[in-house]
């Protein structure tokens, strides 16, 4: 079955989000009914794709939030990126159906992040957007299998 493999593949994204976001461990633990411990959360994620989906749901908005913050803080970037199809809309699960388009847009977002914030801002934004890809990709697979996360 593919789903447990996908759940295990989500572990690196979850680990990096936990390391980068204070308070995320307790929020995830409350959402999945786990002990407030990174190792307990990761064990639950590896064993259950639904738990993986719920866990990723707790971090899934980070890329969009970082993107919106970038636009709000830097109007010149909003102008640079005015042709991006997702500039005013939340990233939807069906958007991931065309990863090629997403990759092109992600490159433009990276250019903008580099323009306004240097490498650290670029890395943070790219990681956040990559987490969104993993979250929505897993959510679509869970939905296809009859789960609703």
Swiss-Prot record:
GO terms for cellular component: T=13 icosahedral viral capsid; viral outer capsid. It is found in: Virion. Assembles to form an icosahedral capsid with a T=13 symmetry. Drives the penetration of the inner capsid (core) into the cytoplasm. Keywords: Capsid protein, Outer capsid protein, T=13 icosahedral capsid protein, Virion. It comes from Pseudomonas phage phi6 (Bacteriophage phi-6). Its main location: virion. This is Major outer capsid protein. The keyword Zinc does not apply. The keyword Kinase does not apply. It comes from the Viruses. The gene is P8. Homotrimer.
